[in-house]
From Swiss-Prot:
Protein's cellular compartments: Membrane
Residues that carry a glycan: 133, 411
Extracellular side: 20-1115
Major place of residence: membrane
Start and stop residues of the Cys-rich GLG1 repeats: 24-69, 71-135, 139-207, 216-276, 277-344, 349-411, 415-475, 477-549, 551-610, 613-676, 677-736, 743-803, 809-867, 868-938, 945-1009, 1010-1070
Organism classification: Eukaryota, Metazoa, Ecdysozoa, Nematoda, Chromadorea
Secretion signal, residue range per the UniProt entry: 1-19
Name the UniProt record assigns to this protein: Golgi apparatus protein 1 homolog
Parts of the chain that traverse the membrane: 1116-1136
Length: 1149
């Protein structure tokens, strides 16, 4: 930039002769003086120069070059100065003004007062104030405009400026040609307009350290400087340094732009970052931009186009202190934007011209950071350090984006200071990129390929295009530079709700009423001293968008959710999370974690005790967000993107809902095996499943459906979902099995089942997270999980199944945790996912009509269990063995026999209802007692009577044990060694099945091969149980099935009636050979059990006689009986019909 001192005292370079010439002949024309003839001929011999007009010649000569000293001869330079003084400062100027502006002076009293100013240059200065008020086409305007051009070439001609700024000119040495007397007589260049330029240079340099850089001038001089700067900003020709520095650039970029109203300056500013622009022109434009930022009145195109709007929206500053923030261009632009968006102004929008100028000036502000004085002041260090390493202005208008990049940095050494950050935020707000992204040329240029490509169809508005860009931020089409610039802009938009025009329009009233937002958000200061809370307003709107008790309006709620869906792509676009979690991100997510995966990283760690202790605020914010995410799956951008094929095919009906309330995730869980499911989607689904398992609040439907039940029954279990599931399951179990009056609501029952199955089916991408499925169970079974290699399982249910298979070897605490799960699955078989999966085919084939909650009852039917597929049979037998351990795992038996159990087994019933035994397996309690009573019911003398339902359930338990001795724990535990020693060959012969174990034991018992007395006692017990009813001896029942149909069809079961009926038929030799043989074998066993272990026999004598007939010593016994019968016959012969009648009665008995 040119910098030459200016001398104020004309006496130093005026010659007395020239003064006398001009003074002596005041009417002589400039062209007639010999001093300038050569210069006029050289520079002004053009058709457009009127050589008869001194004004026209003066304009031509001063336009010949920036430095008149370098352009004109010494004599002509002095003569030009004399004529400028003559034209502008003596009484002839006033006379001319009265001539050309006669009408205007009559109509404007204030303007007329200017003609009474007598001090040199004061009348000129005063009249220049009214140039913009006179008609542009009139002769007065032409006169004043041409005079202004002369005055602005040398500010010594402007009297008030010289007077009021003399001290400043001296202080900054803006008035000294030769600072050293030794230079006396040396001709130093005089540069047009340089006095003001010298002052402006000092002001701009001072702007880096002073809030009000103009304050160094003092109030009087500052007023004059701003006044002159405002006037010269209106006309390109008045800004002489700019005129000469940008003369070629004006021809290059703004050839067709007419001078006046600041149009040329605006055009040059829009092209300032072009690489072909002259650097000197660019530097001067930057200085002017700073002044325009300080005083909006220098933005003439804006003030003229928007004058009605400035008045209507009350944006014109009321106090006239130029240093006030209300004079800043940023404030004016914000005020105009705010006014246009106020409901009362909706019907009268800004004119097209005003809207255009607003966009243009916003665009200039994005490109030229100097237009924001606060930015120049508060970001000077940051700009010098990071954005202008060579001390120049960063090319292509990227300074602001450079600062924006550092604003979002998490590296404390690279972050902006608080004041600079606030200044950047203010500029971004003024630019209003959300309304028109094109004001940000850097963003527009970086994202052009996407704007013209994937987002072309969204170009219905600039706002829609910007939203489209955000939707594609992680798409393959996104280019790194666009992503970077887009997220820099979104970082600030995410921290000020007013920067999103659609959100502002939809939610303005609710933001003010519900979230304490300022009604007029452009105001930096207000009477109530209320500060717009920025991110807090957005956070409030986010929470309110999912508040179903007090919801936002449909329009606002929809807009907030759509916005949050877009911004959930990055943690730093959710300020309440990023600001609270910076340390946590650094600790847990700083290595090999992509920005798009930071949320997942935080969620994987945030529920650990260590995290909660070190980062409580971060934990609280993540909890709030994850609750919203559980309610609205679209917030999980990574999952939504990875699972798009599955969602489109299987979950579209849920995805299209405004809020899916977790249905999409539930659908994805249910479709993990779908062909559209990919590894990435499955991983994201597993991730969120694990999160939701840690805290029941993260399962929206579960939380909502079970809130009252949790409050009533599970209040002391905190938020651990595993504990809540256990607690609710216990409530349901106690109601259904133990008869407790308290039960769950129907909705909670449904969601409990969903939650339980979700817990069962969760998979582990990382085995370290296995414990998250049920932390308490994992803790109490930690050793067992390692010991039996259950940690190698792929799903949680496989881990549990592994522990169930090793139940007898588990520690007490681990047993209690597994027992909890066994109980709820016994109550509702549909919650037994392992059973449902492995028996799906057999359930469909054999149990299609069975209640899903009790499908195990169907599968364990002795006629069905032998026909099941191998995998299903194995799991069914495992469940049968589990149910044999504790009567509470046989809910059907317990409910059917409740009356009998309370009558015959009161102590046992009391025990299973005691809280201290709720987690303890009570082997044989109730069942052993009921079976014992059932056995005793063989004798009528015991007066034991079982209801049909109870009798059927006890019989079922006995029959099931016939096929698997493990279902009779007392027998199996007593005979385990005998089975291993004696029956292993029999098992192998049957193909590995246990169906023949009981037959093997009975055979050994008959032969006396069982040496273990306890085992023999248990076999004898089993024989007595089977004697109660033939159905309890499946082998005998199968052998005699046809005979029972033929001879005992009408005999009711129980109390050995059918057995006695068959014995009676055997006496008559009516039975089939197979049945007779098997009955004879069983009779031997019964008699042996009776003789050795006092097994009770039926009360009927006849039945006993039939048993005796099959006794091993039956020959001698029958001999005695035959003699007795002969004796009776002899008596009958003697007594006739009396004896016959007695015989008949005996026979009937």
């Amino acid at each position: 930039m040119w910098r030459f001192p200016l001398i104020l005292a004309s006496v130093c370079w005026l010659t007395t002769a020239q003064q006398q010439n001009v003074a002596n002949d005041p009417d002589k024309k400039l062209a007639s003086f010999d001093a300038c003839k050569a210069d006029i001929h050289k520079h002004c011999s053009r058709p457009d120069v009127d050589l008869t007009s001194d004004m026209s010649i003066l304009e031509c000569l001063q336009d010949a070059g920036f430095s008149e000293t370098a352009t004109l001869s010494e004599q002509c330079e002095q003569l030009v100065w004399d004529f400028k003084v003559k034209i502008t400062q003596d009484e002839r100027f006033v006379s001319a003004a009265k001539q050309y502006c006669e009408e205007e002076l009559k109509g404007n009293a204030a303007m007329n007062l200017c003609t009474s100013q007598t001090q040199p240059g004061f009348a000129l200065s005063c009249l220049m104030e009214f140039t913009k008020n006179v008609t542009e086409t009139g002769k007065c305007h032409a006169f004043l405009a041409r005079t202004e051009r002369l005055a602005f070439s040398d500010f010594r001609l402007v009297g008030p400026f010289v007077t009021k700024c003399r001290a400043i000119l001296d202080k900054f040495k803006c008035n000294v040609l030769t600072p050293d007397p030794a230079h006396k007589g040396v001709r130093v260049a005089h540069t047009q307009g340089m006095a003001l330029e010298c002052i402006l240079d000092k002001v701009v340099k001072n702007a880096k350290t002073q809030a009000d850089a103009l304050q160094i001038l003092g109030d009087d001089c500052k007023h004059e400087v701003l006044r002159l700067a405002e006037m010269q900003a209106d006309d390109f020709h008045l800004d002489r340094p700019l005129f000469f520095a940008c003369r070629l650039d004006r021809e290059r970029y703004c050839k067709d732009v007419p001078s006046g109203e600041g149009k040329v300056f605006e055009c040059l500013m829009m092209n300032r970052n072009d690489k072909f622009m002259d650097p000197e022109c660019g530097n001067l434009l930057a200085e002017r931009a700073y002044l325009m930022g300080r005083d909006y009145r220098m933005a003439h195109p804006l003030t003229k186009a928007c004058q009605p709007e400035l008045t209507r929206y009350k944006c014109e500053p009321q106090n006239q202190i130029e240093s006030a923030a209300h004079f800043h261009l940023a404030w004016i632009l914000l005020c105009l934007e705010n006014g246009a968006n106020q409901p009362e102004h909706k019907e009268v929008q800004p004119s097209k011209e005003c809207a255009h100028e607003m966009i243009t000036h916003r665009q200039m502000m994005m490109q030229h950071f100097r237009m924001a004085p606060e930015l120049v002041l508060n970001c000077a260090q940051e700009i010098d350090k990071w954005c202008s390493p060579r001390g120049d202005i960063e090319a292509e208008g990227r300074t602001l984006h450079c600062l924006m990049e550092h604003a979002e940095s998490r590296n404390e050494t690279l972050k902006l200071g608080a004041q600079c950050l606030q200044a950047v935020q203010q500029v971004v707000k003024v630019a209003d990129i959300g309304r028109n992204y094109k004001v940000d040329k850097v963003l527009y240029g970086s994202c052009r390929s996407l704007i013209d490509g994937p987002c072309a169809q969204d170009a219905v508005s600039e706002t829609a295009t910007l939203t489209c860009l955000m939707r594609n931020v992680d798409s393959p089409d996104m280019v790194p530079e666009c992503e970077k610039r887009l997220l820099e802009v979104q970082y600030f938009m995410a921290r000020d709700w007013t920067m999103d025009p659609q959100l502002y329009e939809a939610c303005h009233q609710e933001a003010v009423s519900r979230c304490s937002a300022l009604d007029n958000w452009h105001q930096q200061h207000n009477s109530d001293n209320t500060v717009d809370r920025g991110p807090q307003v957005l956070a409030c709107l986010y929470r309110s968008a999912y508040d179903e008790q007090n919801p936002l309006s449909v329009k606002c709620g929809t807009q907030v959710r759509q916005l949050l869906h877009v911004r959930a792509v990055r943690v730093n676009l959710i300020p309440e999370i990023e600001d609270s979690c910076r340390e946590a991100l650094s600790e847990f997510c700083s290595h090999n974690v992509k920005p798009s995966e930071e949320m997942m990283c935080l969620q994987q760690n945030f529920e650990t005790d260590n995290f909660k202790r070190k980062h409580p605020q971060c934990f609280a914010e993540l909890t709030k967000f994850t609750e919203m995410e559980a309610k609205d799956t679209k917030l999980n951008r990574a999952l939504s993107k990875a699972c798009k094929p599955v969602i489109s095919t299987h979950c579209a009906q849920f995805a299209n809902e405004e809020i899916d309330h977790g249905d999409v995730l539930e659908c994805l869980v249910n479709n993990k095996d779908a062909k559209e499911m990919n590894n990435k989607c499955r991983s994201y689904v597993n991730h969120f499943e694990l999160i939701s398992l840690r805290d029941y609040h993260f399962s929206y439907k579960f939380q909502k459906a079970c809130a009252s039940d949790i409050e009533q029954s599970c209040k002391g279990h905190n938020n651990d979902k595993g504990e809540i599931i256990r607690c609710l399951s216990e409530v349901r179990f106690e109601h259904k099995v133990l008869g407790s009056p308290k039960d769950l609501t129907d909705d909670c029952k449904k969601q409990l089942k969903v939650a339980y199955l979700q817990q069962e089916q969760v998979e582990f991408d990382d085995k370290e997270h296995m414990a998250d499925a049920d932390p308490k169970l994992s803790q109490k079974c930690e050793q067992e999980i390692k010991m039996y290699k259950c940690n190698q399982a792929d799903t949680f249910e496989d881990t549990i199944e592994c522990l169930r298979l090793n139940f007898e070897h588990l520690g007490p605490e681990c047993k209690s945790m597994i027992f909890y799960r066994e109980k709820i699955e016994a109550v509702d078989n549909s919650m037994d996912d392992e059973l449902q999966k492995k028996c799906r085919y057999d359930i469909g084939k054999f149990c299609a009509n069975s209640d899903s909650e009790n499908v195990l009852e169907c599968l364990t039917n002795t006629k069905i269990v032998r026909l099941l597929q191998r995998e299903c049979k194995a799991i069914v037998k495992e469940r049968m063995q589990e149910s044999a351990r504790d009567v509470r795992l046989r809910p059907q038996l317990l409910t059917s026999c409740r009356k009998e159990a309370e009558q015959y087994c009161p102590e046992d019933m009391k025990k299973i209802n005691m809280p201290q035994y709720s987690q303890t397996v009570l082997d044989g309690v109730v069942v052993s007692c009921l079976r014992d009573k059932f056995r005793q019911s063989i004798s009528d003398q015991n007066h034991i009577d079982f209801s049909p339902r109870c009798s059927a359930e006890v019989s079922r338990a006995i029959v099931e044990a016939e096929f698997d001795p493990q279902l009779d724990p007392p027998l199996y535990n007593a005979c385990k060694s005998t089975i291993n020693d004696h029956c292993s060959a029999t098992i192998m012969e049957s193909g590995g099945h246990f169906d023949n174990v009981m037959e093997c034991l009975k055979n050994d018992f008959n032969k006396g091969l069982i040496r273990d007395k306890q085992c023999s006692e248990q076999v004898a017990r089993r024989l007595q149980e089977s004697l109660v009813d033939i159905h309890l001896d499946p082998v005998l029942h199968e052998a005699c099935a046809m005979d029972i149909q033929r001879y005992c069809r009408d005999v009711p079961p129980g109390h050995s009636r059918i057995v006695m009926c068959l014995m009676d038929s055997a006496d008559k030799q009516e039975l089939s050979k197979e049945c007779s043989t098997k009955l004879s074998d069983r009779n031997k066993l019964w008699m042996k059990a009776h003789s050795e272990f006092q097994m009770a026999l039926p009360d009927s004598w006849h039945a006993f006689a039939n048993l005796v007939m099959e006794h091993p010593e039956r020959n001698s016994i029958l001999g005695y009986l035959a003699g007795f019968i002969v004796f009776i016959l002899l008596i009958g012969c003697c007594c006739g019909r009396v004896s016959k009648k007695q015989y008949i009665e005996m026979k009937n008995r």
